[in-house]
């Protein structure tokens, strides 16, 4: 059966594009695929007409076999029992459509997904293990194997990223960067890591990916530049073949000397650092400061409309503003002693128990070096003379939520 290392998948969707039976789907959050239920496919067991069968297929020269699902559309009465029982919910019936093969989503063990994966994270159980990425992420900003596509550059909200030339390596100004993680979410090759996290990717849709064959001169610049080897040279007619789906990094388009490639990509919204856990709604906030006053760890700072900064109760000449620890994790990466860490805790959101991150601090390990203070993108952290010397990190106690009279704070 097919196995996927979801942890290191870059969510490019090439596997989905090449699968002949739509047995794998890629989203920013997950990779859903037919694993033939570990060798005992429930769809085969429940099919009342015998339209679905499990067969062994020889998959290598050594004679090793793997199970595959075979579908006979002539026997299928489209009852939908297989769809209902499918654990990953990958099986689908194209109801109401005239198709020779009405059922999609079963694995035929063609291994096209294995062959096309640009980072090798798709394998076959007992035959080929999925690749694993071994990285020692250092610092709150970490760049590894950047291909220089520049896709992240225009997406940075504070213009902290520069790229001298296409195909080079990006640079991120640490003084400007706010550790929001938009670059990491955008990077099609997982080359950027912010605050020590493996990013959740943004949704992405290729609107147009076309080749002007009349303009193409067959130089193969795009073939050589493609980090995933997605582009196939067609030497017989001095052109190339573009893939149906790829990472859409745009290197081929940018490096083509005759502008023969036209790529148009639409990115979904980036995930803000505070989209999960404690979330602030700016439209509802009246900058009263009740949340900052009740926070036991000074993890919220408000400048009121009267010019009072709370919880410091200091008069300032500033516009009304709100800042809080978003549990981005930059401080935990910067800490050389391991005194700060991001830990999961159970929270109830919309009636369901979910895992959410909180910052955990061990004062016994802290040497008060101040590295965390410098790393904090929102300038929330500060050292004090108290027994617990560090303040400003969110422990997700939720006391601020009921304190807000406008309902501007919530748990998501």
Swiss-Prot record:
Transmembrane segments: none
Binding site for [4Fe-4S] cluster: 9, 12, 15, 19, 76, 79, 82, 86, 107, 110, 113, 117, 146, 149, 152, 156, 177, 180, 183, 187, 216, 219, 222, 226, 246, 249, 252, 256, 325, 328, 331, 335, 366, 369, 372, 376, 394, 397, 400, 404
InterPro entries: 3Fe4S_ferredoxin, 4Fe4S_Fe-S-bd, 4Fe4S_Fe_S_CS, Fe-S_Ferredoxin
Required co-factors: [4Fe-4S] cluster
Bound cofactor: record note: Binds 10 [4Fe-4S] clusters.
Highest taxon, organism lineage: Archaea
One of the record's GO molecular function terms: oxidoreductase activity
Pfam families: Fer4, Fer4_21, Fer4_3, Fer4_7
Residues covered by the 4Fe-4S ferredoxin-type domain: 2-29, 30-57, 67-96, 97-127, 138-166, 168-197, 207-236, 238-266, 276-305, 314-345, 357-386, 385-412
Keywords from the named record: 4Fe-4S, Electron transport, Iron, Iron-sulfur, Metal-binding, Repeat, Transport
UniProt protein name: Polyferredoxin protein MvhB
Species in which this protein is naturally found: Methanothermobacter thermautotrophicus (strain ATCC 29096 / DSM 1053 / JCM 10044 / NBRC 100330 / Delta H) (Methanobacterium thermoautotrophicum)
Gene (UniProt): mvhB
């Amino acid at each position: 059966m097919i196995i996927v290392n979801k942890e290191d998948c870059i969510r490019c969707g090439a596997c989905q594009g090449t699968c002949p039976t739509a047995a794998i789907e890629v989203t920013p959050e997950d990779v859903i695929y037919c694993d033939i239920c570990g060798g005992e496919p429930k769809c085969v067991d429940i099919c009342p007409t015998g339209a679905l069968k499990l067969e062994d297929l020889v998959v290598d020269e050594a004679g090793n076999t793997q199970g595959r699902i075979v579908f006979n559309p002539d026997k299928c009465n489209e009852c939908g029992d297989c769809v209902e029982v499918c654990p990953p919910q990958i099986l689908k019936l194209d109801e109401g459509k005239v198709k020779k093969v009405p059922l999609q989503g079963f694995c035929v063990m063609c291994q096209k997904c294995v062959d096309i994966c640009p980072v090798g994270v798709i394998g076959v159980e007992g035959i080929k293990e999925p690749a694993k990425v071994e990285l020692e992420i250092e610092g709150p900003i970490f760049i590894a194997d950047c291909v220089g596509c520049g896709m992240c550059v225009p997406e940075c909200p504070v213009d902290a990223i520069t790229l001298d030339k296409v195909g080079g390596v990006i640079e991120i100004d640490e003084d400007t960067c706010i550790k929001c993680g938009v670059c990491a979410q955008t990077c099609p090759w997982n080359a950027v890591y912010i605050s020590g996290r493996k990013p959740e990717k943004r949704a992405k849709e290729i609107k147009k990916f076309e080749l002007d064959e009349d303009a193409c001169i067959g130089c193969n610049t795009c073939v050589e530049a493609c980090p995933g080897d997605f582009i196939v040279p067609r030497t017989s007619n001095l052109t190339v073949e573009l893939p149906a789906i790829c990472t859409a990094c745009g290197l081929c388009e940018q490096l083509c000397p005759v502008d023969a490639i036209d790529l148009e990509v639409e990115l979904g919204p980036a995930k803000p650092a505070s989209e999960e856990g404690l979330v602030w709604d700016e439209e509802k906030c009246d900058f009263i400061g009740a949340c900052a006053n009740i926070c036991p760890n000074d993890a919220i700072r408000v400048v009121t409309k009267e010019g009072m900064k709370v919880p410091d109760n200091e008069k300032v000449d500033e516009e009304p503003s709100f800042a809080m620890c978003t549990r981005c994790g930059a401080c935990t990466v910067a800490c050389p002693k391991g005194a700060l860490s991001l830990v999961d805790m159970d929270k109830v959101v919309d009636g369901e128990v979910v895992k959410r991150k909180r910052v955990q601090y061990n004062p016994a390990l802290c040497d008060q070096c101040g590295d965390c203070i410098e790393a904090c993108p929102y300038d929330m952290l500060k050292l004090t003379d108290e027994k617990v010397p560090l303040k400003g990190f969110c422990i997700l106690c939720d006391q601020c939520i009921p304190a807000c009279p406008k309902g501007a704070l919530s748990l998501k």
